[in-house]
A protein has these predicted regions:
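Bacterial Sec-dependent N-terminal signal peptides
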Residues: 1-24
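Beta-rich carbohydrate-recognition and catalytic domains
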Residues: 20-171, 175-221, 230-280, 295-299, ...
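Repeated scaffold domains used in trafficking and secretory/extracellular systems
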Residues: 222-224, 287
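Short glycine/serine- and small hydrophobic-enriched flexible loop segments
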Residues: 227-228, 291
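Beta-rich accessory regions
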Residues: 233, 261-274, 278-286, 290-501
């Protein structure tokens, strides 16, 4: 026995390592994923007392959608997340049906408008969510927590808003100081309509107005939010209404936004000649903004679900976990000749966890340039001058015959993100895809920032004027990176790569 003991323990050790490494092949390192099981939309993004909360749609029992409950994670720096126990679980109704906790938001009721908390208590958290009874009803309900979201009580007079509809969901609530009221934005998905309600106590809601039947109506409307957003280089702000709905490419999902004015009752959009999308990739959906951010954040911050319902259930991340969340992104508006446009960037906090791995300046490329860095977890920033080149490409997650290709065509000003040869693509007929967006050069320059994290790519173009988020599932994991120029020489003005600790 003595003799075989070391072999036996080595065998058991290998077994444990093996079973842990296989499903972890695609596990992101700095994007939040639940330790196990299925996740979808972020819910109740709220800041309180030094903690950022990420509640999210979660199935505690498996890695497919079902038993929807609110999972919970917290972070002190929007960077590293700690998973906490399920906050709001699905529950049984007296008639034998179940109520699932669908998407919603969380607010801090610092004036105790709800009366749920002790007199003078300023840290009460209230969750506003859709109570969903499968095949029967969707209405809005509330729950409250006096211990920073660790334990919750459901309001005993739920639901607080019920239109008797089967599809009526995803409340997002803001405090509107001018009227000292809460304003809820919620959608009737099948009618492509958002509704605005107001309440003094989070319990009684009255309809203010409706907005809808315009913009992208190729898919149902979900997860709306209304946010006051600063306009860069001015003291002005505008209101942004975001709606999760269809994608520029038919039958995929994305988020669209409208910019306009909100007077406490009605949202009036600016004239827009085109549909505006928050992120041009296939995998950014259901993002909502944080509530109650401290003043030190001068811009709103959002987090989105990385996935597309088209194939979300089949992404090959192994048996343990499925779905993930974007990094926290701050956003603002830019005034352009065509109207206001969204600009988004990863929050600065991300930098604090990084270490510089490589940097170059003013390098001419003529053909292929292989970077002296390999990896699948990095933050790459590059400023390129195509000069005489007709096409420049950035190739990442590259191995023999495999790469995700970011390509810029100077003549057409088209930037594309091509994952058709990125690795595993056949698990679903609609996964293999190329995104295309128009990106004019700025003073002859193209600037890209790519957050790569095992299986997630978040690409920010021209300092956040465009964003593209996608899953990719490399097979060979060589992690090579190259830049190419075709048809002439191009110049890399600056390039840096940071690894993430
Ligand atoms: C969006 C969504 C929401 C709903 C939730 C259910 O992804 O369909 O409309 O509340 O997911 O999990």
């Amino acid at each position: 026995m003595k003799k075989i003991a070391p072999f036996l323990s080595f065998f058991l050790f290998s077994l444990v390592c093996f079973s842990q490494t296989i499903p972890q092949e695609y596990r992101p390192q700095y994007h939040y994923t639940a330790p196990k099981n299925w996740v979808n939309d972020p819910n109740g993004l709220v800041y309180l007392d030094g903690e950022y909360h990420l509640f999210y749609q979660y199935n505690p029992f498996g890695n497919v959608w079902g038993h929807m409950s609110w999972g919970h994670a917290v972070s002190k720096d929007l960077n590293r997340w700690e998973t906490l126990p399920v906050a709001l679980p699905e529950f049984d109704n007296p008639d034998g049906t179940q109520t699932m906790i669908f998407s919603g938001c969380a607010v801090i009721d610092s004036l105790n408008t709800s009366g749920f908390f002790e007199k003078g208590f300023t840290k009460g958290m209230v969750a506003v969510f859709t109570s969903h009874i499968e095949g029967k009803a969707q209405h809005q309900s509330i729950a409250y927590s006096a211990d920073k979201g660790r334990t919750w009580k459901r309001y005993d007079k739920n639901p607080v808003l019920d239109l008797g509809m089967k599809d009526f969901r995803d409340p997002n609530v803001i405090w509107y100081p001018e009227k000292q009221v809460w304003i809820m934005t919620v959608v009737k998905p099948l009618e492509y309509t958002a509704q605005f309600y107001e309440s003094k106590d989070l319990k009684t809601w009255s309809l203010l107005s409706e907005f809808g039947k315009q913009g992208d109506m190729t898919k149902i409307w979900e997860c709306p939010s209304l946010t006051k957003v600063p306009v860069e280089g001015s003291n002005e702000s505008k209101w942004v209404l975001m709606i999760s709905s269809g994608h520029r490419q038919k039958n995929y999902l994305a988020m669209q936004y409208f910019v306009g004015d909100f007077d406490g009752k009605t949202f009036t959009p600016q004239k827009q000649n085109e549909i505006l999308y928050v992120d041009e990739g296939k995998d950014f959906y259901a993002a909502i903004p944080f509530s109650n951010l401290p003043k030190s954040h001068t811009k709103p911050i959002m987090i989105g679900w990385i996935n597309d319902w088209e194939y979300a259930r089949e992404i090959p991340t192994g048996d343990t976990w499925r779905g993930g969340f974007s990094v926290a992104r701050e956003f603002s508006l830019k005034k352009t000749a065509e109207g206001f446009r969204l600009v988004q960037q990863p929050v600065a906090q991300l930098k604090s966890a990084q270490k510089e791995a490589f940097r170059i300046k003013n390098k001419v490329i003529d053909g292929v340039y292989n970077l002296p860095f390999k990896g699948e977890v990095f933050d790459l920033e590059v400023e390129l001058r195509p000069h005489r080149a007709k096409v420049v490409t950035l190739n990442v997650f590259q191995s023999q015959g495999e790469a995700t290709v970011i390509r810029y065509d100077v003549a057409t000003q088209e930037l594309s993100l091509d994952r058709t040869k990125s690795g595993q693509v056949n698990f679903h007929p609609r996964f293999s895809s190329v995104e295309r967006v128009k990106v004019p050069l700025k003073e002859g320059k193209l600037s890209l920032r790519l957050l790569a994290d095992k299986s997630i790519l978040e690409l920010f173009v021209q300092n956040g004027e465009q964003a593209l988020t996608e899953w990719v599932f490399p097979i060979q994991h060589e992690g090579e990176i190259s830049l190419t120029s075709e048809g002439g020489k191009a110049n890399i003005s600056a390039l840096s790569i940071h690894t993430i600790r």
